[in-house]
Amino acid sequence: MTHTKRTFALIGIAAAGALTLGLAGCSGNSDATGTDDAAGGDDLITVGYVAVGPEGGWRDAHEQAVKDAFTKDAGFDLKYAPAASPTDQKSQLDAFATFVNDEVDAILLTATEASGWDDSLKLAQEAEIPVILLDRGVDSSDDLYATRIAPDNVTVAKSVGEWALTSFPEGANYYVLEGVPGLSVVNERNEGFDDAISGAAGWNKVGAQTANWSADEGKSVTETVLKANNNDIQFIFAQNDEMGIGAAQAVKDAGLTPGTDVKIATIDGTEGALKALAAGELSFVAQYNPFFGDIAVDAVKKAIDGGSLEKVIIVDGETFDSAEAGQAALDAGKGF
């Protein structure tokens, strides 16, 4: 799709050479939604997708939902550029610069880090390319991007805290398994949970540590915490399902019963977490809905046409607080 833009020479020869490899999959491999077919190319809206790439069940479901929404049949040529690793910001900055230099019509961005995006976003703005943030926010002025589409991390995490208060009316020793440091999602989930339990009597935070969204790290961190505290932990808030599932295994390995001796609450709502909830190994799962590709499609079209968008578009989700609720969610196909 052709739009009038100002053209900028944004990247030098060396950077462009490196990006040829980094974006090779955007139009050629099986992971890419877009291709460079000549037929009908001028009629398609070209969208660069600066993505995180493989990181876990939620991320896989979310990125696939975006790919499924931005198809050629829907009028798009999607250029998918996953980060070299889930924490590699440089590859994302390079991909973003390439998309601006290639004069795509819009950019979707899920940042591996919240900071460091000002210059990139300013270049996109100067080139009149709207940027839509998916899931994660950035530490930049909101006039540098069109909108952010995401479930409300603060509200989702607050639901965990509110459930915990009702489950432990006299308080508890608790531990928090956090995601990758520096991400907006981590900060927001801490904020929501802390807001919910702030001032409640009897709540003792034993500590918090990153487990990098990983089941293995969630297990190892929990093992260490239980040993260091003579198993005197009643509640674990895992900021994603994988870490919570790992924590449940550590609880069992310590000779304790998850759901009875130690309650574990998680955020995401993957099929694995719902199965663990149905089995009694998790006690609470807050869904962080990954399926908002269609919302992103509408936002891109509106941004390109010069329409106004809310700066934050909230994606709704659900909570599941019992084995029965977990099984019902599975039966309804709500896992991913």
Residue positions per predicted region:
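Extracytoplasmic "Venus flytrap"
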Residues: T46-D73, K79-D94, T110-A114, E178-E188, ...
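Bacterial lipoprotein signal-peptidase II cleavage site
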Residues: L23-A39
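Hydrophobic alpha-helical segments within soluble ligand-binding/sensing domains
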Residues: Q92, R148-Y174, A215-K219, G269-A273, ...
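Hydrophobic alpha-helical
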Residues: L109-Q125, F193, A211-K275
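Periplasmic-binding protein-like
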Residues: G48-A51, E103-A111, P130-L134, Y175-V176, ...
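Hinge/cleft segment of the Venus flytrap/periplasmic-binding protein
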Residues: I13, D43-L44, L177, P181-V185, ...
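Short beta-strand elements at the ligand-binding edges of bilobed clamshell
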Residues: Y80, S140-W163, V176-V180, A208, ...
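Flexible loop/hinge segments that line or gate small-molecule binding clefts
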Residues: D119-T155, T166, N173, G269-A278, ...
